[in-house]
Amino acid sequence: MSWIEPIISHFCQDLGVPTSSPLSPLIQLEMAQSGTLQLEQHGATLTLWLARSLAWHRCEDAMVKALTLTAAQKSGALPLRAGWLGESQLVLFVSLDERSLTLPLLHQAFEQLLRLQQEVLAP
């Protein structure tokens, strides 16, 4: 069991999702309002991915906004990034060093991803 498993497990429980031990290196949570949240452990990094499918007519504006906001470092203290999956899936993500991972940092990263998503999708 990795030392960060209790942190990830507590985070999932805070979101109302029970976990079992041992945790998978890839956890996928379906969020009712914001799409799919994935937590992926790889090496000494934990990456949070927030993916959401968009209607085709919103894709271009969302892509430009997401890339502009993340490139301009307007996304807050954490290095948020944006990408695109397939034809219509906006992906916002942040990678965290496991050595500095805490429960408050995990919540902060998720909240910043949610705020960025809301800003990108705002009219």
From Swiss-Prot:
One Pfam family matching this protein: Type_III_SycN
Q: How does it sit in the membrane?
A: Peripheral membrane protein
**Keyword check for Transit peptide:** no
Q: Which GO terms describe its biological process?
A: protein secretion
What disulfide bonds does the UniProt entry report for this chain? none
Q: What is its main location?
A: cytoplasm
UniProt keywords, alphabetically:
Cell inner membrane, Cell membrane, Chaperone, Cytoplasm, Membrane, Plasmid
Recorded coiled-coil stretches? none
Q: Where in the cell is it found?
A: Cytoplasm; Cell inner membrane
**Record's GO cellular component, any one?**
cytoplasm
Q: Which domain of life is it from?
A: Bacteria
Q: Which NCBIfam families match?
A: type_III_SycN
The free-text function statement in the UniProt record for this protein reads: Functions as a specific chaperone for YopN. It could facilitate the secretion and the subsequent translocation of YopN.
**Quaternary structure, from the entry:** Interacts with YscB to form a complex which specifically binds to YopN.
What's the protein name?
Chaperone protein SycN
Organism listed in the record: Yersinia pestis
